[in-house]
């Protein structure tokens, strides 16, 4: 099962980030320990949205759509 997720930073500027993963708990830990995507480094994050998908390809397409609407 794959998840498309949106994160919100805990800092005053409220940055957002969209991604996909098969392990959301582990991925959030990586983002919060400066091991995630380059954009997320140096900030603390919380999950504000996620949705499950049965296939990686569908999750990737949905991630792309969500990134386009939030940028």
PLM features: residue spans?
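GIY-YIG nuclease catalytic motif and its immediate N-terminal context
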Residues: 1-53, 58-67, 71
């Amino acid at each position: 099962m794959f998840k498309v997720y949106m994160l919100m930073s805990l800092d005053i500027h409220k940055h957002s980030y969209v991604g996909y993963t098969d392990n959301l708990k582990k991925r959030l830990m990586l983002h919060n320990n400066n091991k995630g995507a380059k954009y997320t480094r140096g900030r603390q994050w919380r999950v504000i949205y996620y949705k499950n998908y049965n296939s990686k390809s569908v999750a990737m397409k949905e991630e792309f759509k969500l990134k386009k609407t939030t940028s």
